[in-house]
Design a protein with these regions (language model features):
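Alpha/beta-hydrolase superfamily serine-hydrolase fold, recognizing
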Residues: 12-14, 46-300
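A glycine/proline-hinged amphipathic helix-loop "lid/cap" segment
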Residues: 1-63, 299-300
Length: 300
């Protein structure tokens, strides 16, 4: 797998994926093309509103209302994909975890700056556990990938601070946990991770917070947050993912704050590798099996 990815990088493909020099329209076009896969005919998609926020219930065969619920904070660099573009990812998680997936179609940047996306996720969660859906919090996992990993942790912080009933767990897959100094002190090798660049994640963070916004805001970059009293966390990352150093730092912060944290590193895996399960990549399937086991072991 990695040989093929390095070959793409050597051919210059890395310059055409997640390139910080791209105009907004180009960046969106690339990200939408990466994520906009169709779902299987036997997957049910029902669009609704939770807490006034557009959401999709994605249900695969064999899953019913008694199954666990995943609240999905989608990736797409804050600027792209949207709910419609992440249905395939919700389907993939639903199949791997045997769960219903609630995909939140949060407002995108730069048209909507922080805290718009986070407000939408918190409002959707409030609707999920209150009158709109009445889901049991102990049967819910909040999960996100890439920028959605940061949003998932930020959502947990807001749930804690607003005294909402806590979900069972949080899961972050290659989360963008620090937008001010992406990847921390770790030297990134762009050939080893051809799909990510620190300047790209920083630029998208600026799109999210807007002019004059604070990239060190703990609800934007959770490495600067107090994580005390959060539910159990799974931080899963590839060891050549550009965000690896950020995940290490968040793990250290979580441990210091007494959070039950599982830190899982997958050798030779790049940013977003979990999404390759839809292409049949064994390493991605193994990662999602780990996610499923983590969630099932803690769902009440």
């Amino acid at each position: 797998m990695m040989r093929g990815l390095r070959s793409l990088a050597d051919q210059g493909m890395a310059d055409r994926l997640l390139n910080p020099a791209d105009a907004m329209a180009v960046a969106r076009e690339k990200l939408n093309a990466l994520h906009g896969h169709p779902v299987a005919p036997d997957t049910r998609v029902n669009w609704t509103e939770l807490g006034g926020v557009r959401c999709a219930w994605v249900q695969v065969p064999g899953v019913d209302n008694a199954s666990p619920c995943l609240l999905l904070c989608h990736g797409g660099a804050y600027i792209a994909a949207g709910g419609d573009g992440y249905l395939f990812y919700a389907e993939m998680l639903g199949r791997a975890c045997g769960a219903r997936v609630c995909l939140v179609d949060y407002r995108l940047a730069p048209e909507n700056h922080y805290p718009a996306a986070l407000d939408d996720l918190v409002d959707a969660y409030r609707g999920l556990v209150n009158e709109d859906a009445g889901e049991a919090p102990g049967r819910i996992a909040i999960i996100g990938d890439s920028c959605g990993g940061a949003l998932a942790v930020a959502t947990l912080l807001r749930i804690r601070d607003e005294d909402l009933p806590a979900p069972a767990v949080g899961v972050a897959l290659g989360g963008w946990f620090d937008h001010e100094t992406p990847s921390g002190d770790r030297e990134a090798d762009p050939i080893r991770d051809p799909f990510a660049h620190p300047d790209f994640t920083r630029a998208r963070g600026l799109d999210y917070v807007g002019m004059g916004g604070d990239l060190r805001n703990p609800f934007v970059s959770p490495v600067y947050a107090s994580l005390k009293d959060l539910p159990p966390l799974l931080l899963q990352v590839g060891d050549v993912d550009l965000t690896f150093g950020d995940a290490e730092r968040l793990r250290a912060r979580a441990n210091a704050d007494g959070v039950d944290t599982t830190f899982s590193v997958h050798p030779e895996m790049i940013h977003g590798f979990q999404g390759l399960a839809s292409a049949g990549i064994p390493e991605a399937h193994a990662a999602l099996a780990e996610v499923a086991a983590f969630i099932s072991s803690r769902i009440r």
